[in-house]
Curated annotation (Swiss-Prot):
GO terms for biological process: cytokinesis by cell plate formation; protein transport. Belongs to the small GTPase superfamily. Rab family. A motif (Effector region) lies at residues 41-49. This is Ras-related protein RABA2a. The gene is RABA2A. A lipid is attached at C214 (S-geranylgeranyl cysteine). It holds the Pfam family Ras. It is found in: Endosome membrane; Golgi apparatus, trans-Golgi network membrane. GO terms for molecular function: GTP binding; GTPase activity.
Length: 217
């Protein structure tokens, strides 16, 4: 939503991180928002979020990133947090095939609960573990194309492509919001003129000219 010029940001975008437990969602969050990485990061309990303000397409955007727990017992809790999300990063671990296989389940849940226009990016994390890779880049790319998702591989440990991933999804969200704003403004303007109504511009201008610029009290 647009903010007044005197506030510190123009837009607030909510983005959710989803995927199985242990795929590195929390470290992607901390790397992007604080440029930190914790080797002994524990599984998120419930829901956490962090923010970062940055420039997107020349506008100041406050990104509110929600880190949702991947454990089954928290699924009912986290489903409520899909509401209001404009973007989603669906993360799997390139060293664990099961986490990639479960992507379709996460995607279905996301599409069931989130806005139909939500921007979704598939992320293959932990590319630094090259010797343990078990999910081919080509397979993930093919799946992403089939489902209409953008795709990127990252390493939160090495800070590889993390910034690019968030910048890409935020830019896409901004483009969609911008189009909606323009469309909304046009709709509002058109709504003020009833179908078939004739407006006498000259009469309106003359009427306005006769009105005093201020009233005395």
């Amino acid at each position: 939503m647009a903010r007044r010029p005197d506030e510190e940001y123009d837009y607030l975008f909510k983005v959710v991180l989803i995927g199985d437990s242990g795929v590195g969602k929390s470290n992607l969050l901390s790397r992007f928002t604080r440029n930190e990485f914790c080797l002994e990061s524990k599984s998120t309990i419930g829901v956490e979020f962090a923010t970062r303000t940055l420039q997107v397409e020349g506008r100041t955007v406050k990104a509110q990133i929600w880190d949702t727990a991947g454990q089954e017992r928290y699924r009912a809790i986290t489903s409520a947090y899909y509401r209001g999300a404009l973007g989603a990063l669906l993360v799997y671990d390139v060293t664990k095939p099961t986490t990639f296989e479960n992507v379709s389940r996460w995607l279905k849940e996301l599409r069931d609960h989130a806005d139909s226009n939500i921007v979704i990016m598939l992320i293959g994390n932990k590319t630094d573990l090259k010797h343990l890779r078990a999910v081919a880049t080509e397979d993930a790319q093919s799946y992403a194309e089939k489902e209409g998702l953008s795709f990127i591989e990252t390493s939160a440990l090495e800070a590889l492509n993390v910034e690019k991933a968030f910048q890409t999804i935020l830019s896409e969200v901004y483009r969609i919001i911008s189009k909606k704003s323009i469309s909304s403004d046009q709709t509002t303007a058109n709504a003020n003129i009833k179908e078939g109504q004739t407006i006498d511009v000259a009469a309106t201008s003359e009427s306005n000219a006769k009105k005093p610029c201020c009233s005395s009290s």
